[in-house]
Amino acid sequence: MKIRQILSIGCFLWILASLRLAAQQPEIQPLPIDPKIRYGQLNNGLTYYIRHNAQPKDRADFFIAQNVGSILEDENQRGLAHFLEHMAFDGTKNFPGHGMDEFTESIGMRGGENFNAYTSFDETVYMIMNAPVTRESIVDSCLLILHDWSG
């Protein structure tokens, strides 16, 4: 009986101490945004971040991150987010069939290396990396691909 009382008091004190420590945790502050980044939110809810980089010269990276991943899948949907990620490379409204492949190859880029995506627990990210932006039409096409990927 005495051991049970001692254990009960010990557990109570441990819980009390844990709650006190949890209450003392400082509030997590958001990371500061680099002042060189221009950002905002469009009327449709899309948040954008733009930063100029001088190196590598005449090259740019384009990303679109969607807040969807495997965590949102029901049991009968396992793998759906990853499957849809792959399907985005099989043609889009503005780049039907192998149109994206033809475009990226025409400007010296390769799928997998410069043109890729991944799906994780809570996000799906599409990437166009190290794109030669020597012509405005290339930038326009890269943004159009991101638009198509956004659904």
State each model region's role.
Residues 1-25:
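Bacterial Sec-dependent N-terminal signal peptides
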Residues 13, 30, 54, 116-118:
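Generic marker of residues within folded, mature protein domains
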Residues 20-23, 38-41, 79-87:
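Short low-complexity stretches enriched in small and charged residues
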Residues 24-38, 129, 136, 140, ...:
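Histidine-acidic residue clusters that define the catalytic metal-binding segment
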Residues 26-65:
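Mature N-terminal segment immediately following signal peptide/propeptide cleavage
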Residues 56, 66-81, 85-151:
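Active-site-adjacent, His/Asp/Glu-enriched structural segments that form or flank metal-binding
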